[in-house]
Regions:
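A short glycine-rich, His/Asp/Glu-containing loop-to-beta-strand
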Residues: 85-106
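Long, contiguous binding/interaction regions
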Residues: 101, 128, 144, 153, ...
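Short, flexible surface segments
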Residues: 106, 143-144
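Short beta-strand His + acidic residue motifs that chelate non-heme Fe in jelly-roll/DSBH
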Residues: 110-113, 130-132, 141, 150-162
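Non-heme Fe(II)/2-oxoglutarate
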Residues: 1-86
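Short, conserved beta-strand element in jelly-roll/cupin
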Residues: 103, 114-130
Length: 170
């Protein structure tokens, strides 16, 4: 409930960034490179990943390589939200990079891809049709307050086959 209330507070202040028009991608960055608010926008909201886009199966790099260790400043606009407390607690236990609220709209999916590092996922809003697939393992991550460590250096995707939004803190 607290995460969902925090999400409502954030959405009153900011809309999702679609990384300059990328279909099926939407994010709100909660932290930034100190003094650089532009590090939360456009391609910086997405970041580098690798994919095999066609039948040849050759891996290609997409988007900009980011040094996520530089993302150490919580965005001031969101300091009054519950996400600040969550961010502080998580950063005391884990070395965090970018922290984002990620939206996956109904009946949408990501590409089959891999990321440069593992991720923490905290589902905020989900439905039974939301599945994350890492290599050949498919799992539904319920919005029950749990923190899930996902090995996103392996090929994976996330899809929302339901009719409600899927929102994760990642």
């Amino acid at each position: 409930k607290k995460l969902q209330e925090g999400l409502k507070q954030v959405l009153r202040l900011k809309n999702y960034d679609n990384a300059n028009g990328i279909k099926n991608f939407a994010a709100i960055c909660l932290n930034q490179i100190p003094g650089k608010p532009e590090s939360t926008k456009g391609n910086f909201a997405r970041g580098v990943y690798w994919t095999k886009p066609d039948h040849f199966g050759n891996e290609v790099t997409r988007d900009k390589i980011l040094d996520e260790t530089l993302y150490t400043e919580f965005v001031k606009d969101f300091e009054h939200t519950y996400f600040k407390e969550v961010y502080s607690k998580l950063s005391s236990k884990f070395k965090l990079g970018r922290v984002r609220i990620l939206l996956k709209e109904p009946r949408s999916t990501l590409s089959w891809h891999r990321d440069p590092e593992p991720r923490l996922h905290i589902p905020i809003i989900t439905n039974p049709g939301c599945i994350m697939v890492i290599e050949k393992v498919a799992k539904h991550l319920p919005a029950d307050g749990s923190v899930y460590i996902t090995n996103n250096v392996k090929y994976h995707n996330a899809f929302n086959g339901g009719e409600e939004n899927r929102v994760h803190l990642v």
